[in-house]
């Protein structure tokens, strides 16, 4: 259960946790909503949840580890719908290339009897690939590990440096930021 919203809370943010109803039930038991928080049971692909979000003070959405389970067309439709509903808003999420998604999805794809891994959301160059979906999207990305850490720092271990180069280099793991702008 992700708590990014709580760790970023400045006491003025409205925090919405969205997940399937059974997950929200567990969340309500383990992490009851705080004063500025609302737990919304939903399927992200059903955009009815858009109307429950108060964007009067702006909107920043985090989707951590979510889109690996979505088809590319589902992510595209969701992002375009969010651009319609939340102009001026920002969506931040993690992504990786096809090789990494294949590795991530290896076990759950077998149990779900899914054969077409290629249909699942993966990107190598987020600004170019996602930016082409819609002119209202301003897309930037940084390496998942290298984008936020200085590998020249002597406190960074050799193992971390190796994993960072494989993750960010070979697998194109990245943190993607999409700003929704008007037409």
Locations of regions flagged by a protein language model:
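Alpha-helical subdomain
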Residues: 1-183
């Amino acid at each position: 259960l992700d708590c990014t919203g709580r760790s970023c809370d400045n006491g003025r943010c409205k925090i919405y946790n969205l997940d399937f109803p059974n997950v929200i039930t567990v969340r309500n038991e383990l992490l009851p909503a705080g004063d500025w928080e609302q737990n919304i049971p939903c399927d992200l692909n059903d955009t009815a949840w858009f109307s429950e979000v108060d964007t009067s003070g702006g909107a920043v959405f985090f989707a951590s580890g979510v889109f690996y389970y979505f088809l590319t067309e589902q992510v595209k439709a969701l992002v375009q719908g969010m651009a319609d509903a939340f102009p001026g808003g920002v969506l931040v999420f993690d992504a990786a290339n096809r090789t990494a998604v294949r590795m991530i999805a290896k076990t759950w794809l077998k149990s779900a009897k899914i054969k077409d891994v290629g249909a699942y959301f993966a990107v190598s160059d987020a600004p170019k690939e996602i930016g082409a979906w819609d002119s209202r999207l301003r897309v930037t990305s940084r390496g998942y590990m290298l984008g936020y850490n200085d590998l020249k720092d002597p406190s960074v271990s050799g193992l971390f440096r190796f994993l960072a180069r494989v993750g960010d280099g070979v697998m194109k793991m990245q943190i993607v930021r999409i700003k929704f702008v008007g037409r």
